[in-house]
Amino acid sequence: MSTHNDEQHEAGADEQEHGHPKKPKRIRRWALLVVVLSVAALAWSCVFHGGLTRKPASFLTTSDAVVAVRLGSGWSTLGDDFRYNDYDGWIVLLDADGRGQVAAVNNVLHGDVLWNERGVFYGSSSHDFLTTEAGTQGFERRYYRSDERQRYALPDGALAVVYGDESGYVVNTVHVDGRVTSVENDKTGGPVGQCGSRILAIIDTKEFRVASAAVFAAYAARSGDKKPPTTLTAVVQLNDHDGEEPPVLAVAPEIDGLNSLQHMFACEGDVITMPSVLADEAAASSHGSTSERQRTLVLQRWDLSTGERSIIPVLDEAGNPLELNDEQGVSEYEAIRVGSEYRFVSWGGDAFAVDLTSGQGRHLFSVDVPTSEFPWSFQVTETGVYTLKARGVDRVVTLSYRPWEGGEWRDIFTTRDLAYYLKEGVLTPTLDIQSFALRPGWDGGAQ
């Protein structure tokens, strides 16, 4: 009560002295409190950890960043009993010195990030995000999914993401005008990729029986075979269709021992080509007694205009099949077309170059990745291969570059600032680098 009276007395004295009433101190105190809270909110929204500034995702801009990184659950905790939403998830934008911005984005499995002329495209289980020089937009998904497969830039400027689980693939497309469309493809899976405006998957009827009737009908119509093989392999289109089942574009008998799990194809017109491994149980490997069967590199080629498939052996310089040893593989590669060659590096770090016209192939190099750092993430340009790796002991992150031919790995930058987000916390498990993308046109490693 006395405080209230004192405030009234002070206000009355001010009125007498200046000829007009002053604002009570109580109002001034509230105004000061508002200012303090505003400053605190701003400080909270921009938290500094070394060379990284933590912001809300809506505050992110591409600024001078050259590398976009997706952090989330991965190899380090593959055997742990955690659900995907028990993990943190982050998007990081780094400049050429390893400094930049980081924002919390809910974790997804196999989170992918794409960077093209529209900006940095990434997502959570419920939203997709596009970060540009001007800021970040969010686009709500019609179907919530926790497992991403790959992101693609379409010729008309739209951005698409394939995600899904055991129920099948869903393609979510963010159009240039901001519209979002979604297409469900029940009980689909397997390799995915892009050819022009089409997002495609390669399925087999043994694993994905829901599509069997349509696939067998397509095979019968094209082959006239009244007794089709027991199992068929087909190329289906995942986007831009209205039916309950994806359209069947090509179909052929399944080949035992033909394996390739990919997220991209070489595309030329209506023809897609995918490096694959063909294992022959009857043929002995030339790599010693530890090998149970011969594994050779082949090109799996599908002509979508005729619906036919062909298998092209990849030959070495001596004209022999290019054989792989027990530790080499081609799955989940990152690839680029350089002249007539398709150059790619697998998720295990094996790099190859294959001439798509002649089938001539070369093994370029293999990366000996320490178990504590496995797997590394890769990106490719016409000049060479980039890898972003987190050291197992202290989670120090290094961006390195190696030319396709005639060179060794060279470090571009090393940063300790990501360790804060990658290390195990009190309530959260260890995180990994799920993927990364380079700013279009930036090739700092080659300079």
Task: List the model feature ranges, each with a label.
Residues T3-D6, D14, V39, C46, ...:
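Compositionally biased regions
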Residues A43-T53, L78-V108, S124-E148, G164-G189, ...:
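Surface-exposed loop/turn elements that mediate protein-protein interactions on large endomembrane-trafficking
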Residues V47-A57, T62-A65:
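Short domain-boundary/entry signatures in modular proteins, especially
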Residues F59-Y84, D112-L130, Q150-D165, Y169-N172, ...:
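Short beta-strand elements that form the blades of beta-propeller/WD-repeat-like
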Residues R28-F48:
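Hydrophobic membrane-insertion alpha-helices, especially the h-region
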Residues T53-F59, V105-R118, Y144-D156, N185-I202, ...:
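Repeated scaffold domains used in trafficking and secretory/extracellular systems
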